[in-house]
UniProtKB/Swiss-Prot annotation:
The gene is aosR. It comes from Mycobacterium tuberculosis (strain ATCC 25618 / H37Rv). It comes from the Bacteria. This is Oxidative stress regulator AosR. Belongs to the AosR family. Pfam families: DUF2017.
Length: 218
């Protein structure tokens, strides 16, 4: 069985990823134009990131293109989003409700209706810009992933976009894997979703390493 993502190599300190991939550390280099963040990807890792990001952009495009239009949008140019939460579970994870009070009583219809109405207004107003931000980050990742793998160098803006986009990819995969706040940490090798879980873990470590080097910790 290939190494499970998240297992550290004792000799190199690198983290082994899905199907034996290795999450390579990022290196921060100071230049006249600001910091640069360097690493490398294997060809199959680059292809995976491109496929996942492309699929996520497609989901967001579908959601955006189906949003309602109204007279106010035509007059002001301010886009109106959906008032209702997405039906697709992956989109619900990417575009969650904006507001839920800690003391909300689900058995109180009046309180629930008030919360849903407030969420609908916030979603209609803010969802379009959130979709745009997620698409921009995912597209920035696509634009900076080397086509056939190999070395890559990110600006600080690129690095922040990668962190946001990879986090969204993890959220999307987490829906398929039904991952909650506490795990699971790994799946048996014969589990039907073991390969997807290994990808999820690989993305987690990739994101963690980039966050650390961006903060100057590594």
């Amino acid at each position: 069985m290939p190494p499970v993502c998240g297992r550290r190599c004792s000799r190199t300190g690198e983290i082994r990823g899905y199907s034996g991939s290795i999450v390579r550390r990022w290196k921060r280099v100071e230049t006249r134009d600001g910091p640069r963040f360097r690493s490398s990807l294997a060809p199959h890792e680059a292809a995976l990131l491109k496929n996942l990001a492309g699929a996520m952009i497609g989901l967001l495009d579908d959601r955006d293109s189906s949003s309602p239009s109204d007279e106010l949008e035509e007059i002001t140019g301010i886009k109106t989003g959906h008032a209702q939460r997405p039906g697709d579970p992956t989109l619900r994870r990417l575009l969650p409700d904006f507001y839920r009070p800690d003391d909300l009583d689900d058995d109180d219809p009046t309180a629930v209706d008030g919360s849903e109405s407030f969420n609908a207004a916030l979603r209609s107003l803010h969802e379009p810009e959130i979709i745009d931000a997620k698409r921009v980050a995912a597209q920035q990742l696509l634009d900076t992933v080397p086509d056939n793998g190999g070395r890559l160098e990110l600006t600080e803006s690129d690095a922040n976009a990668w962190i946001a986009a990879v986090n969204d990819l993890r959220l999307a995969l987490g829906v398929m894997l039904e991952i909650g706040p506490r795990g699971p940490e790994r799946l048996p090798g014969n589990h039907p979703l073991a390969a997807h879980f290994n990808v999820y873990q690989w993305l987690t470590v990739l994101q963690e390493y980039l966050v650390l080097v961006l903060m100057g910790s590594r």
